[in-house]
């Protein structure tokens, strides 16, 4: 890195960069960071050897599923869950989840992701791992009406974790409310959680209309689609972010736009499991904020948001038989500023003075990134997680390629991460 540091003032700069700037502009020059924020964007004539872009925001993941990466490949969703995933998850302990979470957080940071919305058991383990490794996030305790006491656990977990974060000032990591899906929570649970959320005031993280079967069975049960049903329970009153939305209707999209519910597009996972994929261009036409997510890496099988951008771009062009659908800038914003909006992240998602310095820095000297005629096109169609050389979260270097062996200098958790992961896999009998 050609980087100038001033350790006393915590002011430093990233020099000789292409920069993805507001207004869908590509600039050249330096980004100056002071403390947690961007202090200056200095445009000048230079020969860039790197790209600085907003940090990537993964709006739907099950991070600890690094433990089961690739398990059950080739099975459709319901068989994949019932035969491969649920039996292993039933054996997972908090220690196992922590090991998988730390490994997944490191994988994401090494690929330029600065924030993740995670849905998994033992959310406190994920939350603490995020604060220790140095990443932003939204966690949640998964709402399931068949688990005794889960409603009360969800409410208390959200309240107590967020109070801990605020009192300890450990970073932008908060717990949102969550139900797994319409089909795993009954109406009584949804309405009770919605009522409790009048005090908590948190957005909802939920799976919606991932498969045709799920979508149609909800209509048979309630006479309405999952989105319409959830809206009627009041659980969307403080907004949210809905993963998948593969089978959502135009009316569903209108409800989402009205309620401030973002659509989280998971193209790789949906394609791998044969579910189809969300009608993203139509959702955008109807005013829905669309973000991107990897889903769990057991159905992906990585946490590479560059790959997610690439696949999202290709499938909608191919379906429409129109190369103008979802231009590169749209897809980049889905992975950055739209994701920040979906999760309620403050002052981030853009490279502008005063914004928080959540940044992804890419090495432009790689063979496959030259010539650089069209930077947005390169981001979406040529770049990958392995091209990232620096990830910055709130002005702090969270990952730097060429630091210690894994790029996480000074992070004690990282030192034992691989051994912890493999030990957990062994305990689970995999």
What are these regions (language model features)?
Residues 67-99, 106, 133-147, 212-237, ...:
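Active-site gating loops and adjacent loop-to-helix segments of metal-dependent hydrolytic enzymes
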Residues 69-135, 157-168, 417-422, 426:
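Alpha-helical scaffold segments that flank or form the walls of functional sites
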């Amino acid at each position: 890195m050609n980087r100038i540091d001033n350790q006393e003032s915590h002011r430093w700069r990233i020099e000789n960069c292409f920069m993805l700037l507001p207004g869908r502009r590509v600039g050249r020059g330096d980004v100056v960071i002071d403390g947690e924020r961007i202090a200056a964007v200095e445009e000048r004539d230079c020969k860039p050897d790197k790209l600085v872009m907003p940090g990537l925001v993964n709006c739907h993941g099950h991070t600890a599923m690094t433990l089961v990466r690739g398990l059950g490949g080739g099975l459709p969703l319901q068989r994949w869950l019932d035969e491969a995933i649920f039996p292993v998850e039933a054996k997972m302990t908090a220690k196992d989840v922590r090991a998988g979470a730390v490994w997944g957080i490191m994988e994401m940071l090494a690929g330029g992701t600065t924030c993740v919305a995670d849905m998994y058991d033992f959310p406190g383990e994920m939350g603490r791992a995020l604060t220790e490794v140095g990443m932003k996030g939204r966690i949640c305790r998964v709402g399931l009406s068949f688990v005794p006491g889960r409603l009360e656990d969800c409410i208390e977990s959200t309240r107590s974790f967020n109070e801990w974060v605020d009192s300890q000032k450990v970073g932008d990591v908060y717990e949102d409310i969550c139900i797994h899906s319409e089909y795993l929570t009954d109406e009584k649970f949804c309405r009770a959680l919605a009522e409790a959320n009048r005090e908590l005031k948190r957005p909802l993280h939920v799976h919606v209309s991932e498969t045709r079967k799920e979508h149609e069975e909800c209509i048979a049960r309630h006479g309405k689609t999952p989105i319409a049903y959830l809206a009627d329970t009041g659980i969307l009153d403080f907004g949210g972010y809905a993963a998948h939305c593969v089978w959502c209707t135009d009316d569903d999209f209108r409800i989402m736009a009205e309620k401030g519910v973002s659509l989280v597009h998971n193209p790789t996972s949906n394609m791998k499991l044969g579910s189809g994929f969300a009608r993203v261009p139509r959702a955008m036409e109807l005013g829905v904020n669309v973000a991107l997510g990897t889903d769990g890496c057991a159905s992906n099988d990585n946490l590479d948001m560059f790959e997610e951008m690439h696949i999202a771009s290709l499938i909608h062009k191919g379906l429409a038989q129109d190369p103008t659908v979802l231009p590169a800038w749209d897809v980049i914003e889905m992975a950055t500023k739209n994701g920040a909006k979906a999760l309620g992240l403050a002052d981030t998602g853009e490279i502008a003075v005063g914004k928080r310095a959540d940044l992804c820095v890419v090495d432009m000297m790689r063979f496959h990134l030259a010539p650089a005629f069209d930077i947005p096109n390169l981001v979406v169609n040529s770049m990958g997680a392995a091209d990232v050389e620096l990830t910055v979260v709130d002005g702090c270097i969270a990952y730097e390629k060429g630091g210690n062996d894994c790029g996480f200098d000074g992070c004690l958790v990282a030192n034992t991460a691989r051994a912890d992961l493999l030990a957990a896999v062994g305990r689970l009998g995999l």
